Swiss-Prot record:
Compartments where located: Nucleus
Composition bias type Low complexity, residue spans: 261-278
PROSITE patterns named in the record: SAM_MT_TRMB (PS51625)
Region (Disordered): 259-278
Lineage: Eukaryota, Amoebozoa, Evosea, Eumycetozoa, Dictyostelia
Gene3D superfamilies assigned to the protein according to its UniProt record, in alphabetical order: Vaccinia Virus protein VP39
Protein function: Catalyzes the formation of N(7)-methylguanine at position 46 (m7G46) in tRNA.
GO biological process: RNA (guanine-N7)-methylation; tRNA methylation
SUPFAM superfamilies reported for this sequence: S-adenosyl-L-methionine-dependent methyltransferases (SSF53335)
Active site: 142
UniProt-listed Pfam families: Methyltransf_4 (PF02390)
Catalytic activity: guanosine(46) in tRNA + S-adenosyl-L-methionine = N(7)-methylguanosine(46) in tRNA + S-adenosyl-L-homocysteine
Protein's name according to its UniProt entry: tRNA (guanine-N(7)-)-methyltransferase
Natural source organism: Dictyostelium discoideum (Social amoeba)
NCBIfam families hit by this protein: tRNA (guanosine(46)-N7)-methyltransferase TrmB
C-alpha cells in the first residue's frame, strides 16, 4: 500500500462573518490585559509613527466590529487619533491585520487608527482621562433582546455617566441601530441623562460623521442589502444640567436607503421623524 504525503494546509486569513459570533457576552470574565489607569497604558505601540507627537486619542469606536468606521475616520480626521475597542479576539486580530495591510499599501497613511481588545463596559475609564474624547460611537450594538439581559446593553444610566466622564464638554456621542426597540432604549437613556442633550437638527444633518455611521460599517452595509431601516441620533456632552433645554423637541434620523458617503448631508436620503418627549 502506498501512502501519499499530504501537503500542509495553508492558514486562511480571517474574514468578516467567517465563523465568528456576532456578539460576545460582556458579563463574562475574559483573560486579557487592561491598564490600571490611563497613565499606565503605552499608546506608542498602537501608533508607532505618532510616538513623538504626544497626541492623545480623541475618538473612540466602542464595539468597532470589523473596522469599517475606524478606517473611514482615518481619512476624515487625519490629524486626530482614533481607536476601535472590541471584545472578540478573532475580530480584533482581523482589524489589526486590516490596518497593517493598509499601512503597508499606503505608506504614511492610516497611522492614526488602531484597535484594542477590551471590555468597554468594564474598563473604558482605564484607558481615557477625564474629558479626553471629542467623539464616541456606538454603532449597531448587541440588542440583548431578552429582558433579563438588558443589563448587558452598552447604554445604561451608569455607563452614560462613565462616558460623560471621558468626554470633553461639547463632545459628541453617536449611536445607530437597525432594531427600533434598541434605538428607542438608547435614545431615552441619552435624553434623560443630565449630562447629555440632543444636538440641534441642522447641525446633525450636516455632520460629516453621519454618512459614515450609516454606511461605513459591515453591519450597516448588511442592513442595506436587505433594504432594512436604521435609526440614529447625535447627542452632546454638557456640563451644566440646569441649562438643559427641557422644551427642546427631540427628533430621530432614519435611513430607509443608502446615504451617499461623499456628501455630508442626510436630507436627500434620510427621513427626519419627530419623537415626542415623554
Amino acid at each position: 500500500m502506498v501512502y501519499q504525503k499530504q501537503e500542509p494546509k495553508k492558514k486562511k486569513a480571517i474574514k468578516p462573518y467567517h465563523r465568528i459570533k456576532a456578539h460576545a457576552n460582556p458579563a463574562s470574565d475574559y483573560n486579557f490585559y487592561y491598564p490600571t489607569g490611563p497613565e499606565s497604558y503605552d499608546w506608542t505601540k498602537n501608533y508607532p509613527q505618532q510616538a513623538m507627537n504626544e497626541k492623545k486619542v480623541e475618538i473612540a469606536d466602542v464595539g468597532c466590529g470589523y473596522g469599517g468606521l475606524l478606517i473611514s475616520l482615518s481619512s476624515l480626521f487625519p490629524e486626530r487619533l482614533s481607536v476601535g475597542m472590541e471584545l472578540r479576539d478573532k475580530v480584533v486580530q482581523y482589524v489589526e491585520e486590516r490596518i497593517d495591510k493598509l499601512r503597508e499599501k499606503h505608506v504614511g497613511q492610516f497611522q492614526n487608527i488602531s484597535v484594542i481588545r477590551t471590555n468597554a463596559m468594564k474598563y473604558l475609564p482605564n484607558y481615557f482621562e477625564k474629558g479626553q474624547l471629542q467623539k464616541i460611537f456606538f454603532l449597531f450594538p448587541d440588542p440583548h433582546f431578552k429582558k433579563a439581559t438588558h443589563k448587558r446593553r452598552i447604554i445604561s444610566p451608569t455607563l452614560l455617566s462613565e462616558y460623560a466622564y471621558i468626554l470633553a464638554p461639547g463632545a459628541y456621542a453617536y449611536f445607530i441601530s437597525d432594531v427600533e426597540e434598541l434605538y428607542l432604549w438608547m435614545f431615552e437613556h441619552f435624553k434623560n441623562h443630565p449630562l447629555f442633550e440632543q444636538v440641534e437638527r441642522d447641525i446633525a444633518e450636516n455632520d460629516s460623521c453621519i454618512p459614515l455611521i450609516v454606511n461605513s460599517t459591515e453591519e450597516g452595509r448588511k442592513v442595506n442589502r436587505i433594504d432594512g431601516k436604521k435609526w440614529f441620533a447625535v447627542f452632546r456632552r454638557i456640563t451644566d444640567p440646569s441649562k438643559k433645554d427641557l422644551t427642546f423637541k427631540n427628533y430621530t434620523l432614519t435611513s430607509p436607503k443608502e446615504i451617499d458617503s461623499t456628501t455630508t448631508t442626510t436630507t436627500s436620503t434620510a427621513t427626519i421623524t419627530e419623537v415626542e418627549s415623554k
